[in-house]
């Protein structure tokens, strides 16, 4: 119960696509991004460095790269529009930035879903000192 309260408090200050990203992860992967991916490997969570440790961590690496390629916007605060058709997420709206970020978030959520079988608890709260390798390019 205490953990849920802490998560709720943390969400109070979060706006834009971070909340929407959490929603997409829940819809597509069926699990909470905060509870499963906010502190995993070298790339899931704030920042990112070194080499991705497994397929799940690679999802976050690719997501970071996708955000880095978004033009003229702040990926962590922009809101976006999407709809659901036959169980599929369709990114849309008039804001090109929002559409780019939606596509990044959607791809990451699909990647998380597809890699649930290889999720490894040893990478949860992975020490940053283990992420010192030279990173690969996006």
Curated annotation (Swiss-Prot):
It comes from the Eukaryota. Its main location: secreted. Expressed by the venom gland. One of its GO terms (biological process) is negative regulation of T cell proliferation. Binds 1 Ca(2+) ion per subunit. Its cofactor is Ca(2+). InterPro entries: PLipase_A2, PLipase_A2_Asp_AS, PLipase_A2_dom, PLipase_A2_dom_sf, PLipase_A2_His_AS. It catalyses: a 1,2-diacyl-sn-glycero-3-phosphocholine + H2O = a 1-acyl-sn-glycero-3-phosphocholine + a fatty acid + H(+). Residues 1-16 form the signal peptide. PLA2 catalyzes the calcium-dependent hydrolysis of the 2-acyl groups in 3-sn-phosphoglycerides. Homodimer. This is Acidic phospholipase A2. It comes from Crotalus atrox (Western diamondback rattlesnake).
